[in-house]
A protein has these predicted regions:
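A long amphipathic alpha-helix within ATP-dependent nucleotide-binding catalytic cores
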Residues: 130-161, 185-263
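Conserved oxyanion/phosphate-binding beta-strand-loop segments in alpha/beta enzyme cores
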Residues: 1-14
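C-terminal active-site "lid" helix and adjoining low-complexity regulatory extension at the edge
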Residues: 221-239, 249, 262-317
């Protein structure tokens, strides 16, 4: 009974996602461009697509010796694994505290949750990243020290601590579904659904929120701010969808998750890409992916520019 109901709603399951869409539409040879955030950044730069600036790439344990002096150049930053997933291993440093004593500068890092880390703790965390603790494959990895992005004022009342991001599912270059992920206290200020962030579905026609869930349970208000979650209208909506559509051209993956952040000064910029995007976006939108994917497969024109593909999506979904 439940299976039939889900099928009638057009809900895409894990097996069909892999068999009908990922395996058929994603070239394995292109996966490194998406899985490795360092390669993604290089590709995006070549395509003129804005991303957060990478300050440092830590590739081996020897590089940790000079880390202290290098971090003194920054007021804030983000540490993330190059090949991580689901937000694991990411630490946001919102403030660098520099204390001078006996001619030496001591460095303390204040995290987004206000906890302090000294330089040895930072090195220890990066060592874990290098060992592959957070990587998709479990193999050794690189650590990225990246510019911290400021929160767009539209989210002031809808986010606890961290920066919300926007997930767009793109199929053969056409945006088919989207949601905004809003950090909560329970998610430790991270826009991560698995850790307790809010997933709020977005109407493709106008970028307004239509429904919201926490751990698959429908919610009406943000648990930490009390603000109502429905009807939030995102600015730069067409630009957000066009950026997502352009990422298909950039990496040539037919079934793609595109994560975008809204910045106060640059507008929408690319955060990262995902070749195996999760299915929780359907619950956030109370809608199934299958009808939209099949409409693109059967009816969408081929060889259109990104802006024209976005026009089709906004009119049909």
């Amino acid at each position: 009974m439940i299976f039939r109901d889900l099928k009638e709603m057009g809900i895409l399951g894990i097996n069909n996602r892999v068999g009908r869409y990922i395996l058929r539409h994603n070239k394995r040879s292109m996966y490194p461009l998406v899985d490795d955030k360092v390669l993604t950044a290089l590709r995006a730069e070549a395509w003129g697509i804005a991303m957060p600036q990478n300050y440092l790439i830590v590739e081996n344990y020897g590089s940790l010796k000079n880390l202290h002096s290098k971090l003194l150049n920054y007021d804030s930053f983000v540490i993330k694994p190059a090949n991580g997933s689901q937000g694991n291993g990411i630490i946001v440093i919102k403030e660098i505290i520099k204390e001078e004593k006996d001619g030496e500068i001591r460095l303390l890092c204040r995290r987004s949750n206000d906890k302090l880390m000294d330089i040895d703790e930072v090195k220890h965390h990066i060592s874990g990243i290098l060992s592959g603790l957070y990587s998709l494959s479990g193999q050794s990895d690189k650590a990225i020290i990246q510019a911290k992005i400021d929160k767009h004022p539209i989210f002031s009342n809808y986010s606890f601590g961290g920066i919300p991001d926007i997930r767009v599912i793109v199929f053969e270059g056409y945006p088919v579904m989207s949601m905004v992920r809003l950090p909560t206290k329970n998610s430790d200020g991270k826009a991560n659904l698995h850790q307790g962030a809010i997933g709020a579905g977005l109407n493709l026609k106008d970028g307004a929120t239509n429904n919201a869930v926490i751990r698959n349970l429908v919610v009406d208000c943000h648990p930490d701010t009390g603000f109502k979650l429905s009807g939030l209208q995102l600015p730069f909506w067409r630009e957000i969808l066009e950026l997502a559509a352009q990422c298909y051209d950039m990496v040539e993956l037919g079934y793609l998750g595109v994560d975008i952040v809204l910045t106060p000064d640059q507008g929408p910029i690319l955060l990262e890409l995902n070749a195996r995007p999760g299915l929780g976006i359907q619950i956030a939108n109370l809608a199934g992916l299958v009808p939209r994917l099949e409409k693109v497969r059967l009816e969408a024109p081929k060889n259109l520019l990104a802006k024209d593909r976005v026009k089709f999506s906004m009119e049909n979904f």
